C-alpha cells in the first residue's frame, strides 16, 4: 500500500545532507509520478522548504510528517454519534468505484456498532443494480427498500426514509446511479434525490487507483450535486498513494472512510496520522 509514494519520499529525504532548495525542487517532480497533483506537490514543497530553512536541526522525516498533516486538516466527525434519527446518508460515485459494495461495508460497520440500518436501492437504471444492492444488503444483514427497475429513484429514497421513521431505524443509506459522470440526466436525477431525501451526510465514493481522474470526478460532483466528504476505495491495490493528499489539497474535502479490501469488514474511519505513518520512509534505509 502506497509503496510508490513512500519510495519517492525516500529518494528525496534519505541523504545525510539535506538542502532545502534541492528537496523542494525534487518534490513536485517525483510526487506527480505517485498521483499527487502538481498543485499539492508544489505546496508541500514550499512547506518543507520553509520548515527546513527555519530550523536546520529538524529531522527531515518529522518535517515531512508535519507538512503533510498541515495540508490535511483534522476533521472531527463520528458517524456513530449523531443526534438525528433516521440519519440519512446519500452515496454518489460513478460505476467502477465500488460504490455499491462500499454501501454494504458501511451498513456492516454501522450494524457492527449496534446501529439499525436500511438501504434504499435508488439506482433503478443500471441492469442488475437492484439485485446487486439487495444481495449486498442481505450479506450485511440489512433490509433493502426496492422498487422495479426504471422506477423513480427519488420515490425509493422517500419510501426508505418513511420506512425508517415508522420503525425507529437509525440510518438510511441511499444508493444512486453511477453512469458516466458527464451524463446531464443522471446529474439532474441526483439533484432531485438530494432535494427529496434531504440527506444529513452526502458521501462521494472514489477509488484510489484512478489518480487525477478521481479528483476530476470529485470536482464535477461538487459543482453539480455537492457532497460533504469522501470514501476512498481500493486502497489495498493502490501502489501510488497520492490521491488522498490531492483530495484534501485540491478539493478541500475530508476523507471520512477508506476501504482496504474485499470483505465486509474492510472499511475503517480515515485517520490522517495512519496515512502519514504509511508514507514516511524508514530511517535505517538512509543513504549518503
From Swiss-Prot:
GO biological-process terms attached to the record: SRP-dependent cotranslational protein targeting to membrane
Membrane topology field: Peripheral membrane protein
Tree of life domain: Archaea
Cellular localisation: Cell membrane; Cytoplasm
Residue ranges of coiled coil: none
MF annotations from Gene Ontology: ATP hydrolysis activity; GTP binding; GTPase activity; signal recognition particle binding
Binding site for GTP: 93-100, 175-179, 233-236
Protein name, per record: Signal recognition particle receptor FtsY
Classification lineage: Archaea, Methanobacteriati, Thermoplasmatota, Thermoplasmata, Thermoplasmatales
Gene name per UniProt: ftsY
Amino acid at each position: 500500500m502506497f509503496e510508490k509514494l513512500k519510495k519517492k519520499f525516500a529518494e528525496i529525504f534519505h541523504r545525510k545532507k539535506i538542502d532545502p532548495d534541492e528537496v523542494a525542487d525534487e518534490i513536485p517532480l517525483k510526487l506527480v509520478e505517485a498521483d499527487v497533483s502538481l498543485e499539492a506537490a508544489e505546496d508541500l514543497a514550499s512547506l518543507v522548504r520553509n520548515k527546513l530553512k527555519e530550523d536546520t536541526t529538524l529531522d527531515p522525516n518529522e518535517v515531512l510528517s508535519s507538512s503533510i498533516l498541515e495540508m490535511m486538516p483534522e476533521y472531527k466527525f463520528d458517524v456513530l454519534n449523531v443526534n438525528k434519527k433516521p440519519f440519512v446518508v446519500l452515496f454518489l460515485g460513478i460505476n467502477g468505484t465500488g460504490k455499491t459494495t462500499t454501501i454494504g461495508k458501511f451498513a456492516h460497520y454501522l450494524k457492527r456498532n449496534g446501529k439499525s440500518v436500511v438501504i434504499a436501492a435508488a439506482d433503478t437504471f443500471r441492469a442488475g443494480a437492484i439485485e446487486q444492492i439487495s444481495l449486498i444488503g442481505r450479506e450485511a444483514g440489512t433490509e433493502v427498500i426496492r422498487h422495479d427497475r426504471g422506477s423513480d429513484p427519488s420515490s425509493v429514497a422517500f419510501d426508505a426514509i418513511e420506512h425508517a421513521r415508522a420503525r425507529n431505524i437509525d440510518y438510511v443509506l441511499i444508493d444512486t446511479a453511477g453512469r458516466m459522470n458527464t451524463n446531464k440526466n443522471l446529474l439532474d436525477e441526483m439533484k432531485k434525490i438530494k432535494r427529496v431525501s434531504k440527506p444529513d451526510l452526502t458521501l462521494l465514493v472514489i477509488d484510489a487507483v484512478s489518480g487525477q481522474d478521481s479528483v476530476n470526478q470529485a470536482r464535477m460532483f461538487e459543482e453539480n450535486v455537492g457532497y460533504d466528504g469522501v470514501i476512498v476505495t481500493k486502497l489495498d491495490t493502490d501502489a501510488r498513494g497520492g490521491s488522498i493528499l490531492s483530495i484534501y489539497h485540491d478539493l478541500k474535502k475530508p476523507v471520512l472512510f477508506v476501504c482496504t479490501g474485499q470483505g465486509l469488514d474492510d472499511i475503517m474511519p480515515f485517520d490522517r496520522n495512519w496515512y502519514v505513518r504509511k508514507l514516511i520512509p524508514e530511517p535505517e534505509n538512509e543513504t549518503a
